[in-house]
């Protein structure tokens, strides 16, 4: 089976569902409403308009006179506007910035489904084994779990759609600068696995560099996860030896150095802002009952935004069912399950503990 069908399904399913939501909510051109919400209305739309003018007229990329009495534009660009997709504004007609932002939001949701499906197909070797009678979900060679190739491929597509339509995307799709990292994260993780397993650094370096350039804030969280996933994945592929550590450190630093063109001037600006005075919490606190977090993975939960709220964990009720199946699956050895389950528990604690939350953010 070719990749095209499952990848197309992974792109089209969230795309169609998002369009149906737009029709239901009467979002233009299906009505007279728009997606402008909170900061998207007060900040992002004016910022996108300013970027469009600079791209079309060749204005200064370093400073803007249209923000108050004048303000630095580099740090604003680095956080809000650095997505490569935003450069499509140069082709977009003036006066239709809101429509551009709507299209961009929907496009990134669909692309998230595609990239996550591609990751699953590569991670579980679905595409490589599709020419055989069955695709193999490789745990260990002696205890491989076999699925028909078409089932494995389209199961990956459904998981990709669940990722694209998860509660986080439902809550923050209007935060356009964050969703690029949702698109790129699966590629970064796949690149890391190729780096460890096959000594192929290209995808890891390029995807991580673009991720950091697109939005350094979410990229911080991705980089923390990469350290954890590297340790876990390396323990499962020790044949790669300790040189994998050197490769991981080198190409991670190289990607960070690539992003430094925006990070360094932004760090200077942030050092002069009020946020620079925020310090590590002195006492440990728990935001809410950890057991109650399970409810955030259930059907029909409300999404939350803001600084103090329940985490948006829902990505389909079937995900919880699959977690229980994974725990009780005898084909997967406990020496492989325990580190992965420990990582899930660590995430669970991070959502509720103020110190871990501070580190992630």
PLM feature segments, named:
Residues 17-29, 262, 349-354:
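Alpha-helical transmembrane segments of multi-pass membrane proteins
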Residues 1-27, 247:
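Start-transfer (signal-anchor) and selected internal transmembrane alpha helices
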Residues 14-18, 106-122, 145-148, 152-235, ...:
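Membrane-embedded helix bundles of polyisoprenyl
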Residues 125-152:
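Intrinsically disordered, low-complexity terminal tails and inter-domain linkers enriched
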Residues 38, 42-53, 78, 84, ...:
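Periplasmic/ER-lumenal interhelical loops and adjacent helix-loop junctions
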Residues 22-24, 121-124, 191-197, 230-239, ...:
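Structural signal for the C-terminal ends of transmembrane alpha-helices
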Residues 14-21, 322-326, 343-350:
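Hydrophobic core segments of alpha-helical transmembrane domains in multi-pass membrane transport
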Residues 24-123, 155-186, 214, 301-306:
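Active-site lumenal/periplasmic loops and adjacent helix-entry segments of GT-C-fold
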């Amino acid at each position: 089976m070719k990749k095209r069908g499952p990848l197309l399904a992974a792109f089209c399913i969230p795309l169609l569902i998002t369009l149906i939501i737009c029709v239901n909510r009467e979002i233009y051109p299906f009505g007279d409403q728009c997606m402008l919400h909170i900061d998207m209305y007060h900040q992002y739309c004016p910022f996108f308009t300013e970027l469009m003018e600079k791209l079309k007229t060749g204005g200064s990329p370093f400073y803007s006179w249209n923000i108050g009495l004048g303000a630095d534009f580099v740090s604003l660009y680095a956080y809000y506007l650095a997505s490569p997709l935003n450069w499509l504004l140069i082709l977009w007609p003036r006066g239709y910035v809101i429509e551009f932002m709507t299209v961009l939001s929907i496009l990134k949701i669909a692309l998230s489904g595609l990239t996550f499906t591609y990751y699953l197909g590569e991670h579980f070797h679905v595409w490589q084994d599709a020419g055989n009678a069955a695709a193999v979900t490789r745990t260990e060679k002696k205890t491989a779990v076999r699925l028909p190739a078409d089932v494995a491929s389209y199961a990956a597509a459904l998981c990709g759609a669940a990722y694209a339509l998860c509660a986080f995307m439902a809550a923050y799709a209007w935060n356009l600068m964050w969703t690029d990292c949702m698109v790129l994260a699966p590629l970064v993780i796949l690149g890391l696995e190729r780096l460890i397993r096959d000594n192929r650094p290209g995808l890891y370096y390029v995807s991580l560099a673009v991720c950091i350039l697109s939005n350094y804030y979410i990229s911080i969280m991705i980089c923390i996860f990469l350290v954890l996933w590297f340790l876990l994945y390396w323990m499962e592929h020790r044949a790669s030896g300790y040189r994998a550590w050197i490769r991981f450190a080198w190409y991670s630093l190289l990607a960070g150095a690539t992003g430094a063109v925006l990070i360094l001037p932004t760090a200077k600006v942030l050092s002069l802002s009020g946020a620079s005075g925020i310090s590590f919490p002195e006492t440990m606190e728990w935001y809410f009952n950890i057991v109650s977090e399970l409810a955030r993975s259930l059907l029909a939960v409300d999404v939350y935004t803001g600084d103090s709220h329940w985490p948006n964990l829902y990505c389909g009720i079937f995900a919880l069912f699959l977690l229980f199946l994974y725990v009780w699956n005898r084909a997967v050895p406990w020496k492989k399950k325990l580190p992965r389950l420990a990582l899930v528990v660590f995430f669970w604690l991070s959502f509720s503990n103020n110190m871990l939350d501070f580190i992630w953010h």
